């Protein structure tokens, strides 16, 4: 295990440090997001998973809202979210609260994610679908990304969400195939994750699919390249790479701090393979503001071009 973080690995303070780092207007945006979440009793993965980019994203007026409560039924060895085999039932008003909060923020792109809920028959797919539909009703031009579990491999649940009106279907494979048993809960596995991403694309081919991989867990370059090859084979459009950070001493240790140069190498490999977008860097996370900005403009551009083509051929 490395002794401390390298000098080039710096994380800005997300809360108290935010006011001095950003302008007063930006800090007010951070406070606005935090206040609206607290008032509506909503959770974000930004806080629960101790994301290092919380200051940047919240100051940009966006966050990743975590549906289905804040307690996960699984116990992955990299994750800081609370776990319990029998978490409280989901709040039936959560989809409505989420729509209210997001519309108030005035954003054009939102990410919805959740804990794993293996205790719910459909894994929470219908809850997600209802939230997406309410968001679209309140703001039709809003782009919605859903970062979801593997739904225990239940393809009916994948289909429910894929057809809900969302724009980006995201599910994280997390790590290379060899390391899956050591990193993820036993109920998750590499092939099951690939099958859910593949089915989402089969059900709705125009849907953007996305996944994320943590580096620094002991993977080899060949394994990372093979993972990208597997993802492209099932039509995944977007992949992100970020450095794994150990949340507590009870979680997996960091094997190495991957250099910025290596992250850039993986970005180039992914782009050469044909991914529509690759975000790769030590601080990149699956729900990352810079990536959302790029995806938003890419989706709008491609849809505008498609509409023009239809008009010309009419």
Swiss-Prot record:
- What's the EC number here? 2.8.1.8
Residues that coordinate or bind [4Fe-4S] cluster 1: 46, 51, 57, 287
Q: Which GO terms describe its cellular component?
A: mitochondrion
By its UniProt entry, which SMART domains does this protein fall under? Elp3 (SM00729)
Q: Which family does it belong to?
A: Belongs to the radical SAM superfamily. Lipoyl synthase family.
Q: What are the UniProt keywords, alphabetically?
A: 4Fe-4S, Iron, Iron-sulfur, Metal-binding, Mitochondrion, S-adenosyl-L-methionine, Transferase
Q: List required co-factors.
A: [4Fe-4S] cluster
Domain called Radical SAM core: residue spans = 58-276
Q: What else is known?
A: This protein may be expected to contain an N-terminal transit peptide but none has been predicted.
Against Gene3D superfamilies, the record matches this protein to:
Aldolase class I
> What residues does [4Fe-4S] cluster 2 bind to?
72, 76, 79
HAMAP family in the record: Lipoyl_synth
The metabolic or biological pathway listed in the UniProt record of this protein is: Protein modification; protein lipoylation via endogenous pathway; protein N(6)-(lipoyl)lysine from octanoyl-[acyl-carrier-protein]: step 2/2
Q: How is the cofactor bound?
A: Binds 2 [4Fe-4S] clusters per subunit. One cluster is coordinated with 3 cysteines and an exchangeable S-adenosyl-L-methionine.
The record's CDD domains line, in alphabetical order, gives: Radical_SAM
| Spans annotated as Disordered | 1-21
Q: Which molecular-function annotation in GO is an example for this chain? A: metal ion binding
Q: Indicate what this protein is called per its UniProt record.
A: Lipoyl synthase 2, mitochondrial
Its UniProt entry gives the catalysed reaction(s) as: [[Fe-S] cluster scaffold protein carrying a second [4Fe-4S](2+) cluster] + N(6)-octanoyl-L-lysyl-[protein] + 2 oxidized [2Fe-2S]-[ferredoxin] + 2 S-adenosyl-L-methionine + 4 H(+) = [[Fe-S] cluster scaffold protein] + N(6)-[(R)-dihydrolipoyl]-L-lysyl-[protein] + 4 Fe(3+) + 2 hydrogen sulfide + 2 5'-deoxyadenosine + 2 L-methionine + 2 reduced [2Fe-2S]-[ferredoxin]
**Pfam families (UniProt xref):** Radical_SAM
């Amino acid at each position: 295990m490395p002794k401390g973080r390298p000098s080039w690995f710096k994380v800005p303070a997300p809360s108290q440090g935010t006011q001095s780092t950003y302008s007063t207007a930006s800090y007010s945006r951070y406070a606005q997001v935090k206040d609206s979440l607290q008032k509506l009793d909503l959770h974000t993965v930004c806080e629960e998973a101790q994301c290092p980019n919380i200051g940047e994203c919240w100051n940009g007026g966006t966050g990743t809202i975590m549906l289905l409560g804040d307690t996960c039924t699984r116990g992955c060895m990299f994750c800081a979210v609370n776990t319990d085999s029998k978490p409280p039932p989901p709040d039936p008003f959560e989809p409505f609260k989420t729509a209210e909060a997001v519309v108030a923020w005035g954003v054009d792109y939102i990410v919805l994610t959740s804990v794993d809920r293996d205790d719910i028959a459909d894994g929470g797919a219908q809850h997600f679908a209802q939230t997406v539909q309410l968001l679209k009703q309140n703001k039709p031009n809003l782009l919605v990304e859903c970062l979801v579990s593997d739904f225990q491999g239940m393809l009916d649940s994948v289909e429910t969400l894929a057809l809900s009106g969302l724009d980006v279907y995201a599910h994280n494979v997390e790590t290379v195939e060899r390391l899956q048993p050591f990193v993820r809960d036993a109920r998750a596995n590499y092939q099951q994750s690939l099958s859910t991403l593949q089915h989402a694309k089969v059900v709705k081919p125009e849907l953007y699919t996305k996944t994320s991989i943590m580096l620094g867990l002991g993977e080899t370059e060949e394994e990372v390249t093979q993972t990208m090859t597997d993802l492209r084979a099932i039509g995944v459009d977007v992949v992100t790479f970020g450095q794994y950070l150990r949340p507590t001493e009870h979680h997996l240790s960091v094997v190495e701090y991957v250099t910025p140069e290596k992250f850039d190498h993986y970005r180039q490999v992914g782009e050469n393979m044909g991914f529509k977008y690759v975000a790769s860097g030590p601080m990149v996370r699956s729900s990352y503001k810079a990536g959302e900005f790029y995806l938003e403009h890419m989706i709008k551009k491609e849809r505008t071009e498609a509409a023009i083509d239809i008009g010309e051929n009419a």
